[in-house]
From Swiss-Prot:
It comes from Shigella flexneri. Heterododecamer (2C3:3R2) of six catalytic PyrB chains organized as two trimers (C3), and six regulatory PyrI chains organized as three dimers (R2). This is Aspartate carbamoyltransferase regulatory chain. It holds the Pfam family PyrI_C. Involved in allosteric regulation of aspartate carbamoyltransferase. The gene is pyrI. InterPro entries: Asp_carbamoyltransf_reg_N (IPR020545), Asp_carbamoylTrfase_reg (IPR002801), Asp_carbamoyltrfase_reg_C (IPR020542), Asp_carbatrfase_reg_C_sf (IPR036792), Asp_carbatrfase_reg_N_sf (IPR036793). Zn(2+) binds at C109, C114, C138, C141. GO terms for biological process: 'de novo' pyrimidine nucleobase biosynthetic process; pyrimidine nucleotide biosynthetic process. Keywords: Metal-binding, Pyrimidine biosynthesis, Zinc. NCBIfam families: ATCase_reg. It comes from the Bacteria. Belongs to the PyrI family. One of its GO terms (cellular component) is aspartate carbamoyltransferase complex.
Length: 153
């Protein structure tokens, strides 16, 4: 194996690989989706070279598989991501996120007057695709925000 073909992040026997994450987004995904709340080994590659993207992030989680809902929620942050299911070091399934109708329990409403900040309720946003943007509407205050505003919160 030549130096150019060497794996930059160790292979896993069984679990999930989230590939083609835009550079600088990997840590945000780990935090928002609470992917670190496990006792399983997690391998993170940051700013890895990518032919398509220039640079990319990569997350590997052993013995853990994402639900279809979790995969789709990645669409806001990494619409071009590929989620691979690994078994016995082989890719046994591949999926790409598609924009869900709702995103629950992940984001925080940017409206400081929203009841979701004062009450013990789970966040919930309706997702709408616009011409050049994605709009998120809070279930509680019913205010609509550009997804960039909510993601920066």
């Amino acid at each position: 194996m030549t130096h150019d073909n060497k794996l930059q992040v160790e292979a896993i026997k069984r679990g999930t690989v989230i590939d083609h994450i835009p550079a600088q987004i990997g840590f945000k995904l780990l935090s928002l989706f609470k992917l670190t709340e496990t006792d399983q080994r997690i391998t993170i590659g940051l700013n890895l070279p990518s032919g398509e993207m220039g640079r990319k992030d990569l997350i590997k989680i052993e013995n853990t598989f994402l639900s279809e809902e979790q995969v789709d929620q990645l669409a806001l942050y990494a619409p071009q991501a590929t989620v691979n299911r690994i078994d016995n070091y082989e890719v046994v399934g591949k999926s790409r996120p598609s924009l869900p109708e709702r995103i629950d329990n992940v984001l925080v409403c940017p409206n400081s007057n929203c009841i979701s900040h004062a009450e013990p309720v789970s966040s919930s946003f309706a997702v709408r695709k616009r011409a050049n943007d994605i709009a998120l509407k809070c279930k509680y205050c019913e205010k609509e925000f550009s997804h960039n505003v909510v993601l920066a919160n």
